[in-house]
Structures are given as structure tokens and as C-alpha cells.
């Protein structure tokens, strides 16, 4: 801290010089010395807060000062430093205190309360500890890698005390932390390990800070669903082909080694990220047969075969049970009314009563 250039009484200058000399020579006051007033223990504050340094005195003290290392901050009521953040808080018969506002890391270190009593200057020291919230200063960029490759992720953070860094995989299947280090190494990465990885830095000074890195794992297509389908002639038919791949697969359809093009009469090919749909609007005899779905990306290709076959409808057998009525005009049988069958037994029951 800068020193103020001002005139001070000679006695103060001599006292301050002796205090600085004692400080430089490392002359401490014993903790068990009950005859000498003591400064407080270590003071811990967070960056940006105010630190109060207190020194207990009594009526035997004739002069008192606060020093930071070899720089005099206050001597009595006189301010010796130019730092506007340092103010005198109390100068009484029992206490001599200063306060430092908006504390920063460079304020950390030893502070000394120096007193003059019985013509002998003595000192008592307090250490100011400045805590700093964690801050992530460097992380890996999002990465894209082929399945089976090795991945190294970095997360560098600062803070006081030094923050603890942890890595975890943001995935429903992930359990707990996968690393408690600045570096996360993944050997032979699989497609299940793709997704976001979160770096967290914490030191209990403030809430943890987090940053995420996206890891994309590329792999060749894998067809997960391709089923044969039966459709009657003249009906609408659909063949589906589902495939997983990163990057997304391109789909192609073939019938008997002949590629089917989009817009071909009576057909529609609809390709999405993870599936392809081949639609027949009016199935004919010529449409039946073997079809092949081919899924491909930069890493490879795969195919699956399926059959579009004719599905025949089974005619319902005409009803010829009790109450069936034959239509003489059409020759068809239909279910007739059964009311006349119930009339006779009901009439017989009525006569008995």
C-alpha cells in the first residue's frame, strides 16, 4: 500500500521507525504475555468484503500503530498510507482498529499492531487471509471423435483455497463422478459415452461453477428394425427401415438390385434422421418381392432385406343358425327376428296364472 507524504511529529516518526525495525527483525510478543495487549487471531474474509483488524490496548499504551509488512498504515489517528480503502475504525483506551474495504488478493499477508508502553515498543501480528470464489479459466472445446478413439478433456480453475475439480457424464445411466482431477481421460470411447461432460469447480467460498463440454462419438450405421410386411392387392403398403448412426445415415432402397428413386410412380421414399419409409399407394402384383434397405455414412454402410408379400383376406361364413332368414331375391342369409320364438312359451306361462 502506498505511503502518504505528510508531516508527522518527530516522536511518531521515531516510534514508527522503531516499530518497523522490530517488525523487520521479527520481534514477536509471546502469546502468554498477559502484560501486553494482543491483536486478534487470523482474519479470513472473501474477496470484495471488508476486513476489520482489531488490537486490544489498555491505559499503559502511549502510542499505537498498524503496519502492513514494513509499511505504516495508521499511527494513532494519523493515516500514513494513500489507499482510500483503509480507514481508522476505533482509537480508544481499549481498542485500536482499522478496516480495509473491498479486500483483494494482494491485501493478503501479515499485519502488525505495534504499541509503545514503558518506553519499549512491542508488536503483535495478525495474518489476513483472502478467500476467492472459484473461477474456471480454461476448458476443452466441444469434440467430435470416432468410436474407439481416446479423449482427453481439460478443466483449469482458480480460487483461494484451490478449488476441487470434478467431472461427471450428464447421462441417465451415469452414476456419481467419473473423475476428480483437472483432466479426464477416456480410452477407447464408445457410443454410449457420447453426450455432455460437466466440469465443476468448488472451494466452499461460493457456489460451485460449472462448464460443459459436448463429446460427439461417430460410428457407422446399425439397422435396428426392418420387417417384412403383408399387404392385399390394391391396398396401401409401407416398408420401414430404422438405423442408428452418427453422423445420420443416408438411406437407399433397392428391389432386385434396382435402385428405387424418389418420385417413381406409385412410390414414395421418405428419409429422416433415423429411419426411412417406403410407401406403396396402390399395391399391385408387380410390387411383391424382396426389397433391400441400405444405410450409409462416412464411416461405413450396412443393409437389411425384407419382403413385401401378398396378404389374402378371409371371407366371413354366412350366418345359418337359429333365426337365420334366406333372402329369395339375393340368395343371401341374414339373421331374422326371434320374437315369434318367444311368443308361444310366454303365452303358455300366462295361462297358468
Swiss-Prot record:
- UniProt-listed PROSITE patterns: IG_LIKE (PS50835)
Give the family from UniProt: Belongs to the immunoglobulin superfamily. IgLON family.
Q: Which UniProt keywords apply?
A: Cell adhesion, Cell membrane, Disulfide bond, Glycoprotein, GPI-anchor, Immunoglobulin domain, Lipoprotein, Membrane, Repeat, Signal
Q: List the InterPro entries.
A: Ig-like_dom, Ig-like_dom_sf, Ig-like_fold, Ig_I-set, Ig_sub, Ig_sub2, IgLON_domain, Immunoglobulin_dom
Biological-process GO terms, alphabetical: cell adhesion
Location in or out of the cell? Cell membrane
PANTHER family for the chain = IGLON FAMILY OF IMMUNOGLOBULIN SUPERFAMILY-RELATED (PTHR42757), NEUROTRIMIN (PTHR42757:SF9)
One Pfam family name is ig
Q: What is this protein called?
A: Protein CEPU-1
Q: What does the record give as the function of this protein?
A: It may be a cellular address molecule specific to Purkinje cells. It may represent a receptor or a subunit of a receptor complex.
**Propeptide positions, renumbered to this chain?**
331-353
Which cysteines bridge via disulfide bonds? Answer: 55-113, 155-199, 241-293
Q: Covalent lipidation (GPI-anchor amidated serine) residues? A: 330
Q: Where is the signal peptide?
A: 1-28
